Amino acid sequence: MSLAVVRDLRVARAPVTAQDLAALQTDVLAGFVLARAAAGLSDGTIASDVLHLEQVRAWFGRPLWDMEPPDADAYFGKVLRDTAKGTRLSRAQALKTYFLFLELRHKAGIHQMTGRIVECPIDEMNRPRGRQQAKLRIPPTAAQVGRLFAGWREELATCRKFAPAARNYTACRLLSEVGLRVNEACKLDLPDIKWELGRFGKLHVRHGQGARGSGPRERMVPLINNAGQTLRWFVEDVWGQFGDDHTRPGVPLLPSERKNADGTASRIGDETLRSALAKAAGTHLPDWPDVVTPHVLRHFCASQLYLGGMDLIAIQATLGHAWIATTMQYVHVPGTHIEDAWIAGQQRAAARLKGLPR
C-alpha cells in the first residue's frame, strides 16, 4: 500500500486581491450582524459588539481571521493592560463570539480563498479572567428626592410648555415610586393602566427587560407608593393636551410633541427623560455630587420599598428581576441598619421572654 503526501492546510493558496478581501470582510461582518439580530439581541448590544471588533481590527491592521494566540496575547496583555476590566471582558467576549460565527458559517469559504484555518485566538491561557460587576449606584436620600420633585413641581406653574414638562415630571415620579426602567416607561400605552385590578390598580409593563436572550418579559406592577395618584393626575389633567385620541389602538401613555405621518402623537424617547431629569437635578439638588439618572431613581425605589417593610421577593417582582441576587444589589440601607436590626431583634427576644418565671 502506497502512502499519499498530505498537504499542509495552513499553506496559503493563490493570493487574492485586496478588493476581494475587503468584500469578504464586509460580507462576513454583515452576516454576523444579521445572525445576532436573528438571535434576538438588541440593536445596542449588536452595535457594541461591532464597535469592539472594529477597534481590534484597527489595531491589528489585517482581517480578524488572521489573528493568532500571540496576537491576542499582545493586544490584551499590552494594549489593554491598563484599561477597565469590563472593557477587556466585553472585547474578549465579542471576539470569541465573532470567531464562533466564522467557524460555524465561513470556515470553508475563508480557507478556500485565503488558505487559512479559522481558529479563535483567545484560549484558556490568555482569556481575560473575572466577571463584570454592575456599577454601584448610591441613590439620594428620601429627603433629597422629595426636595427634587417638590422644586420640579413648583416649576410646572411657570414653565413655558406645561404639558411636556408635566409629562417628564410624571415619568420620573413613576421611576422613583414603582421602579420602572426608563425604556419600559417610554413604551407604555394608555390602556396599560389597569385601574380596576388589585387594591390600587396595576400597570401592565409589556416590554420588560429580558435576560439571556429570553426577549421582553411582561409583568404587572401595582400602583403603590402614590404611583396611582401620580398617574391619575397626569391622565385626567395633562394627557389630553397632547391632542391625541384616547381610543386609538397603541396610543402612548407618554406622548411626544412630535406627530406621526397620520397626525397622531408619537412616543417619547428615553433621552428626553434623561436630559429632563438631569436638568431638574442640577437645579434642585445642587449639593448632590453625582448625576441623577433614571436608573438611580430605580435604585432609590428599591431602597425605599425595603426600608418601608416590603420583602425582597415582592421587590423582585415589582422591579422585574429574574434573580433575587440582582434585587439585593439595588437595595441600599442607611449606615445604622445593622445596629437597628440588632436592637430590634433584642427587643423581640425580650418581648418573647417577658412573663416567664425567673
Residue ranges and their predicted role:
Residues 157-160, 274-317:
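Short, basic (Lys/Arg/His-rich) helix/loop patches that form interaction surfaces
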Residues 7-14, 77, 108-152, 209-212, ...:
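Flexible interdomain linker/hinge and immediately adjacent N-terminus
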